[in-house]
From Swiss-Prot:
GTP binds at G13, S14, G15, K16, S17, T18, T174, K175, M176, D177. A motif (Gly-Pro-Asn (GPN)-loop) lies at residues 72-74. This is GPN-loop GTPase 3. The record marks N74 as: Stabilizes the phosphate intermediate. Residues 265-277 have a biased composition (Acidic residues).
Amino acid sequence: MPRYAQLVMGPAGSGKSTYCSTMVQHCETLNRSVQVVNLDPAAEHFDYPVLADIRELIEVDDVMEDRSLRFGPNGGLVYCMEYFANNFDWLESCLGHTEDDYILFDCPGQIELYTHLPVMKYLVEQLQQWEFRVCGVFLVDSQFMVESFKFLSGVLAALSAMVSLEIPQCNIMTKMDLLSKKAKKEIEKFLDPDMYSMIEDTPSRFKSTKFKKLTEALCGLVDDYSMVRFLPFDRSDEECMNIVLQHIDFAIQYGEDLEFKEPRENEEDKSENFDEYFQDRTDES
């Protein structure tokens, strides 16, 4: 039986921990068992129980206080993640070997972990060796994405993670419940965007022809290949959360290997009568 994992990624403040907490509660209402692993060594607080916490292995504060290392916040976090990559046996012992696991990995927000460093790629490969089907879940703050150029910046961040990790990925706009009605209408065009028309709407923002050509080339890459699309995530809307979960489940083929109960005898009789009915209709025609 395969195991399933979501790598919950995104910039700092995009709502990764809130997403994990909300998704755990939502899955509980669906009678689905979901666990969370915290992979952020700089995390201070989260309101959900964790299966494993990287801070039990190493913490950013301890690294920064080590005078022999002399790391700042970013350097300390990179050091922690590289140390983690050299100690995957700790994670394996925390996860155990239970079949049909469904685990959310709450990841750090530093984008260089996905674009410049191989740490997260190593994690994906290790999880796949442990028979996990892995889906990336990249979050961006919807309040940040209401302008065309900011939206393009978020698209490129999501695309860089997608290209680097080489796994199925769902891109999500979070905090939709915090938007005003006017902002919600404005942001609808960014969920399934026409990149070219977005650039045409802001011609006065281009300060040089080179910048315009670069922007048009990036928009063409995203638009022509339909590489990045976003799903809205409103934690107050059960249907919205269902849609997000269904997209992720489809990406990792969740449920295809679940064992189903055998039909009872009366159900078998009904199915036989159902087949006979259609056979009779075929004979008549």
